[in-house]
């Protein structure tokens, strides 16, 4: 196999041109064999096989800088840069990351995970290159879906104005950019990809002297050309008006043409856009038919395309179903998502109430501001968004929502430790930033039943902004409590008090049982609401305890534990040990939630160990 001989991009450049199609075929088979076992981002990688091979054929990513946007499509890049043998550990604890990571390889120029930032990052690198008098190529690889994010246009605007030479590789798989249809645009695309076209363009301008725009003939021809371009080739004028040289659109699976186009882009000066059409899921029939299903997928049977383990009910699906039911009773309720309809469980809402469902694209800040406008006019907007992406809209939460005390409801999905996507996708900051905003109510269900109750509260009983934070996946095994009290005692005890919220309640209850067997009487207090904190109720629960442990899967700064420790000190409540059991200041890596909880001492075993150590020190 050719792929077995590829240990670095130098090996790709050493291949004969006629070997490259076979390499692409082997790469797709490699992806199928590995991702079907580990799960991961599949269809997006199938779509960029030829493009990635062409990049490594033309550029030297050990020297040049390739900045991925989001990074979903980096698997092929990793396989070609010396990491094939690690794919059995993909997205696993201490294994190969599913996203670009500079600590893994010199070929990974920048960490990726969130969308729309690649152009800005690449411009920063290009400007550094100029200031440092260095010589290397800079590329930003961005998908058309990421162009729904405003940050991408901020970057493009600045790149065009800068005049810096860098290349924006636009991977257009048809999700948000209209395709160009017909033979003439295709012919023009081929013409514009040739160096002779640009030599002629320069020569033609020279015919009219130093100020060609002063010539009536030149101005007429320029207007005619622009009019034809806008009719036949609408994408090009956007980038050219911004100051880019636009190349394309071209077939992203035509490897020889890709190599020619990238070589020409490399030789140009100033900012360049190379517009490439690809097919998401190419080469695997099931992914071609349903690329969305195979975008991020759990382990599956490669023969049938079916998941090896049938998905069960999740917090996301319960949220979407409950919200849809409530919307059937109240026409003011609207649902908003930021390109995550299926992931946030809102498909059922969109099907039942399409006129009140809004997908704003990768534009979380816009989603929050739009929700604020809807709330101001009497609607009840509900924005379902992953915790890690909500942090992109912090200013809007403060300025547009909280300052006016608007009734905006946030469904903060994937809160806490998420799992295999690693540092960029855990939801470990929302506790700190949401509880810091005056006027916000933050609710934390530990079960599906509690989620239903709290969503009803948020919609109909609580004034002002409300956030409901819930984890990825299913509920734990314990007796659910649907009390609307801010703090609920789940288990009696007097020596140690465990305080927690969300799905960590299950870990606290298990730990309390083990501690009881060891002779330590342990109380468990579940917080249904972490903002505003009912400190009086919580302090009543902690009074007289020898050890108080606050268990959270978030960072310590701004945590509930930090707030409670301060409240205990202010109230003069003294116990032998007040322990904040959380992530401290560590970004959690890839791994299953159970593995990560164990690593950071957030599972029942970790809690038992900490409490026993504290109590033994006291004795």
Segments from the language model and where they lie:
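N-terminal amphipathic, basic-rich helices that act as targeting or association modules
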Residues: 1-80, 238-244, 251-258, 275-276
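Cofactor-binding active-site loop characterized by glycine-rich and histidine/acidic residues
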Residues: 41-162, 315, 332-333, 337-338, ...
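Non-catalytic terminal/interface segments that mediate subunit docking, oligomerization
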Residues: 65, 278-390, 396-406, 499-502
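A glycine-rich helix N-cap at a beta->alpha junction
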Residues: 86-96, 161-175, 196, 402-414
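Long, well-ordered, tryptophan-enriched scaffold segments
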Residues: 173-319
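Structural signature of the thiamine diphosphate
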Residues: 217-286, 407-413, 432-479, 547, ...
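Glycine-/acidic-rich phosphate or pyrophosphate-binding loops and their flanking alpha/beta elements
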Residues: 233, 260-263, 295-296, 314-329, ...
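Peripheral docking tails and interdomain loops at the edges
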Residues: 300, 307-311, 419-421, 440-441, ...
């Amino acid at each position: 196999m050719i792929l077995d001989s590829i240990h670095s991009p130098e090996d790709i450049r050493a291949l004969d041109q006629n070997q490259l199609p076979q390499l692409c075929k082997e790469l797709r088979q490699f992806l199928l064999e590995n991702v079907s076992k580990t799960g991961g981002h599949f269809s997006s990688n199938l779509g960029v096989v030829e493009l990635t091979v062409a990049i490594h054929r033309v550029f030297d990513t050990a020297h040049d800088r390739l900045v991925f946007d989001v990074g979903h499509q980096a698997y092929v890049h990793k396989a070609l840069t010396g990491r094939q043998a690690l794919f059995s550990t993909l997205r696993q604890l201490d294994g190969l990351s599913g996203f670009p990571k500079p600590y893994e390889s010199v070929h990974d120029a920048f960490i990726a995970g969130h969308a729309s930032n690649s152009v800005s990052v690449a411009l920063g690198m290009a400007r550094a290159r100029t200031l440092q008098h260095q010589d290397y190529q800079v590329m930003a690889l961005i998908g058309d879906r990421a162009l729904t994010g405003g940050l991408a246009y901020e970057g493009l605007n600045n790149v065009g104005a800068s005049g810096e030479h860098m290349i924006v590789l636009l991977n257009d798989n048809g999700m948000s950019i209209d395709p160009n249809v017909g033979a003439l645009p295709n012919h023009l695309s081929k013409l514009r990809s040739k160096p002779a076209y640009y030599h002629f363009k320069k020569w033609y301008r020279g015919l009219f002297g130093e100020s060609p725009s002063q010539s009536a003939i030149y101005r007429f021809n320029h207007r005619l050309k622009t009019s034809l371009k806008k009719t036949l080739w609408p994408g090009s004028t956007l980038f050219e008006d911004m100051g880019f040289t636009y190349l394309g659109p071209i077939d992203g699976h035509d490897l020889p043409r890709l190599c020619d186009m990238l070589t020409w882009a490399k030789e140009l000066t100033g900012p360049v856009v190379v517009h490439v059409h690809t097919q998401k899921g190419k080469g695997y029939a099931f992914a071609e038919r349903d690329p969305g299903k195979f975008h991020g997928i759990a382990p599956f049977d490669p023969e049938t395309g079916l998941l090896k383990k049938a998905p069960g009910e999740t917090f996301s699906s319960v949220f979407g179903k409950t919200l849809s039911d409530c919307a059937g009773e109240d026409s003011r309720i609207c649902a908003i998502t930021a390109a995550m309809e299926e992931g946030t469980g809102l498909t059922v809402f969109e099907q039942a109430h399409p006129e009140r469902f809004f997908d704003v694209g990768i534009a979380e800040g816009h989603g929050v501001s739009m929700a604020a406008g809807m709330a101001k006019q009497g609607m009840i907007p509900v924005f379902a968004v992953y915790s890690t992406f909500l942090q992109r809209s912090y200013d809007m939460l403060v300025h547009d929502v909280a300052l006016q005390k608007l009734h905006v409801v946030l469904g903060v999905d994937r809160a806490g430790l998420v799992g295999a996507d690693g540092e960029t996708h855990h939801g470990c900051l929302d506790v700190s930033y949401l509880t810091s905003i005056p006027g916000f109510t933050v609710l934390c269900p530990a079960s599906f039943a509690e989620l239903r109750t709290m969503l009803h509260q948020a919609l109909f009983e609580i004034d002002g902004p409300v956030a409901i934070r819930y984890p990825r996946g299913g509920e734990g095994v314990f007796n659910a409590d649907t009390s609307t009290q801010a703090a609920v005692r789940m288990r009696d005890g007097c020596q140690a008090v465990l305080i927690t919220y969300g799905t960590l309640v299950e870990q606290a209850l298990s730990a309390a049982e083990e501690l009881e067997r060891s002779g330590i009487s342990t109380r468990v207090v579940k917080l249904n609401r972490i903002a505003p904190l009912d400190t009086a109720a919580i302090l009543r629960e902690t009074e007289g305890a020898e050890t108080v442990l606050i268990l959270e899967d978030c960072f310590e700064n701004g945590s509930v534990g930090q707030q409670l420790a301060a409240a205990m000190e202010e109230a003069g409540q003294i116990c032998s040990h007040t322990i904040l059991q959380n992530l401290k200041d560590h970004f959690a890596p890839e791994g299953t939630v159970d593995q990560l909880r164990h690593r950071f001492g957030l599972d029942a075993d970790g809690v038992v160990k900490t409490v026993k150590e504290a109590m033994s020190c006291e004795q």
